[in-house]
UniProtKB/Swiss-Prot annotation:
InterPro entries: YbaB-like_sf (IPR036894), YbaB/EbfC (IPR004401). It comes from Bordetella parapertussis (strain 12822 / ATCC BAA-587 / NCTC 13253). Binds to DNA and alters its conformation. May be involved in regulation of gene expression, nucleoid organization and DNA protection. Transmembrane segments: none annotated. PANTHER family: NUCLEOID-ASSOCIATED PROTEIN YBAB (PTHR33449:SF1). SUPFAM superfamilies: YbaB-like (SSF82607). It is found in: Cytoplasm, Nucleoid. The keyword Isomerase does not apply. This is Nucleoid-associated protein BPP1222.
Length: 108
C-alpha cells in the first residue's frame, strides 16, 4: 500500500472514531419508554441502558406483588428493546460503508 493511501486510511479511521464517539454521546441523551399492562407500568431509560424512571399506576399498588413484578420486568424489557433498536438506527449511519462481519453490532 502506498504511503498516501495509508495516510488517507488513517484519516478516515480517525474521522470514523470521532463520529462513533459523537453518536455514543448522543445515545446517552436519547430516552425511550417501555410500557406494560396497558401503560400502567412504564420504564424510561436512555439508549445507553441507564434507567431514569419507573412509573407505576397507583391502582396497581394494592394488587398482587407477583403480577406487579412481572409488569415491571415486562416494561423494562420493552424499554430495553426500544433502546437497542434506536441505538442500531443511530449507529447505522455512522457505520454505513464499513465492511463489518455479519451480525457484528456497534458499539462493541
Amino acid at each position: 500500500m502506498m504511503k498516501g493511501q495509508l495516510a488517507g486510511l488513517m484519516r478516515q479511521a480517525q474521522q470514523m472514531q470521532e463520529n462513533m464517539k459523537k453518536a455514543q454521546d448522543a445515545l446517552a441523551e436519547i430516552q425511550v419508554e417501555g410500557a406494560a399492562g396497558g401503560g400502567l407500568v412504564k420504564v424510561t431509560m436512555t439508549c445507553r441502558h441507564d434507567v431514569k424512571r419507573v412509573a407505576i399506576d397507583p391502582s396497581l399498588l394494592g394488587e398482587d406483588k407477583d403480577m406487579l413484578e412481572d409488569l415491571v420486568a415486562a416494561a423494562f424489557n420493552d424499554a430495553l428493546r426500544k433502546a437497542e433498536a434506536t441505538s442500531q438506527e443511530k449507529m447505522a449511519s455512522v457505520t454505513a460503508g464499513m465492511p463489518l462481519p455479519p451480525g457484528m453490532k456497534l458499539p462493541f
